[in-house]
Amino acid sequence: METIDIAAVKPPISLKEFQRIDIRVGTIEGYEDIKGANRLIKLQVNLGDHQRNILAGIKTERADPRDIIGRQALFVINLEPRTMMGEVSEGMLFDIGYADGITPVLAVPEKPVPNGTRAG
Protein backbone atom coordinates (compact mmCIF):
# COMPACT_ATOMS: atom_id res chain seq x y z
CA MET A 1 0.00 0.00 0.00
CA GLU A 2 1.25 3.48 -0.86
CA THR A 3 1.78 5.99 1.95
CA ILE A 4 0.83 9.67 2.03
CA ASP A 5 1.29 12.76 4.13
CA ILE A 6 -2.19 13.35 5.51
CA ALA A 7 -3.58 16.68 4.29
CA ALA A 8 -5.13 19.18 6.67
CA VAL A 9 -8.92 19.07 6.94
CA LYS A 10 -10.58 21.71 4.76
CA PRO A 11 -12.72 24.43 6.38
CA PRO A 12 -16.23 23.31 7.36
CA ILE A 13 -19.18 23.70 5.02
CA SER A 14 -22.82 23.59 6.02
CA LEU A 15 -25.00 20.57 5.43
CA LYS A 16 -27.08 22.76 3.12
CA GLU A 17 -23.98 23.49 1.00
CA PHE A 18 -23.07 19.80 0.87
CA GLN A 19 -26.61 18.81 -0.16
CA ARG A 20 -26.27 20.95 -3.30
CA ILE A 21 -23.72 18.48 -4.70
CA ASP A 22 -25.44 15.81 -6.81
CA ILE A 23 -23.32 12.64 -6.64
CA ARG A 24 -24.67 9.62 -8.51
CA VAL A 25 -23.65 6.13 -9.53
CA GLY A 26 -23.10 5.56 -13.22
CA THR A 27 -21.69 2.79 -15.37
CA ILE A 28 -18.76 3.61 -17.64
CA GLU A 29 -19.87 2.19 -20.98
CA GLY A 30 -17.06 3.40 -23.18
CA TYR A 31 -14.24 5.84 -23.68
CA GLU A 32 -12.57 7.80 -26.44
CA ASP A 33 -9.10 9.25 -26.66
CA ILE A 34 -9.02 13.02 -27.04
CA LYS A 35 -6.76 14.21 -29.83
CA GLY A 36 -3.63 15.88 -28.45
CA ALA A 37 -4.41 15.05 -24.81
CA ASN A 38 -1.75 13.32 -22.73
CA ARG A 39 -3.98 12.39 -19.79
CA LEU A 40 -7.55 13.30 -20.70
CA ILE A 41 -10.09 10.78 -22.02
CA LYS A 42 -13.82 11.08 -22.69
CA LEU A 43 -15.99 8.59 -20.80
CA GLN A 44 -19.48 7.63 -21.92
CA VAL A 45 -21.45 7.19 -18.69
CA ASN A 46 -24.89 5.62 -18.22
CA LEU A 47 -26.70 7.42 -15.40
CA GLY A 48 -29.94 5.44 -15.65
CA ASP A 49 -32.29 7.90 -17.30
CA HIS A 50 -29.64 9.50 -19.51
CA GLN A 51 -26.08 9.28 -20.83
CA ARG A 52 -23.31 11.82 -20.25
CA ASN A 53 -19.86 12.47 -21.63
CA ILE A 54 -17.47 13.07 -18.76
CA LEU A 55 -13.84 14.00 -19.28
CA ALA A 56 -11.32 12.54 -16.86
CA GLY A 57 -7.54 12.86 -16.62
CA ILE A 58 -6.96 9.15 -16.10
CA LYS A 59 -5.28 7.98 -19.32
CA THR A 60 -1.86 7.49 -17.70
CA GLU A 61 -3.16 6.02 -14.43
CA ARG A 62 -3.87 2.60 -15.89
CA ALA A 63 -2.03 0.28 -18.26
CA ASP A 64 -5.25 0.12 -20.31
CA PRO A 65 -8.10 2.60 -19.76
CA ARG A 66 -10.50 0.01 -21.18
CA ASP A 67 -10.16 -1.82 -17.84
CA ILE A 68 -12.79 0.48 -16.34
CA ILE A 69 -15.43 -0.12 -19.05
CA GLY A 70 -18.42 -1.80 -17.44
CA ARG A 71 -17.48 -0.58 -13.96
CA GLN A 72 -19.77 1.51 -11.79
CA ALA A 73 -18.32 4.64 -10.22
CA LEU A 74 -19.40 7.86 -8.51
CA PHE A 75 -19.86 11.05 -10.54
CA VAL A 76 -20.71 14.65 -9.68
CA ILE A 77 -23.42 15.45 -12.22
CA ASN A 78 -24.51 19.00 -11.40
CA LEU A 79 -21.29 20.84 -12.25
CA GLU A 80 -21.54 23.41 -15.00
CA PRO A 81 -20.36 21.96 -18.33
CA ARG A 82 -16.67 22.60 -18.93
CA THR A 83 -14.79 22.60 -22.23
CA MET A 84 -11.31 21.08 -22.24
CA MET A 85 -9.23 20.26 -25.33
CA GLY A 86 -12.25 21.16 -27.48
CA GLU A 87 -14.53 18.61 -25.74
CA VAL A 88 -17.35 19.31 -23.27
CA SER A 89 -17.44 17.53 -19.92
CA GLU A 90 -20.87 17.11 -18.35
CA GLY A 91 -19.73 16.13 -14.86
CA MET A 92 -16.77 14.85 -12.87
CA LEU A 93 -15.53 11.37 -12.05
CA PHE A 94 -14.90 10.84 -8.34
CA ASP A 95 -11.59 9.15 -7.74
CA ILE A 96 -9.50 8.49 -4.67
CA GLY A 97 -5.82 9.32 -4.36
CA TYR A 98 -5.12 11.89 -7.07
CA ALA A 99 -5.11 14.87 -4.68
CA ASP A 100 -2.61 13.04 -2.46
CA GLY A 101 -0.23 12.11 -5.25
CA ILE A 102 -0.82 8.37 -5.21
CA THR A 103 -2.12 6.17 -8.01
CA PRO A 104 -5.84 6.98 -8.14
CA VAL A 105 -8.60 4.39 -7.90
CA LEU A 106 -12.29 4.71 -8.69
CA ALA A 107 -14.78 5.48 -5.92
CA VAL A 108 -17.24 2.61 -6.39
CA PRO A 109 -20.28 1.13 -4.66
CA GLU A 110 -19.51 -2.07 -2.74
CA LYS A 111 -22.10 -3.97 -4.81
CA PRO A 112 -24.01 -3.13 -8.02
CA VAL A 113 -26.82 -0.58 -7.64
CA PRO A 114 -29.12 0.95 -10.26
CA ASN A 115 -27.46 3.62 -12.40
CA GLY A 116 -28.55 7.06 -11.23
CA THR A 117 -28.63 6.08 -7.55
CA ARG A 118 -27.73 9.10 -5.41
CA ALA A 119 -24.90 9.15 -2.88
CA GLY A 120 -25.16 11.01 0.39
Task: Give a label for each model feature.
Residues 1-120:
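Phosphate-backbone binding interfaces of nucleic-acid-interacting proteins
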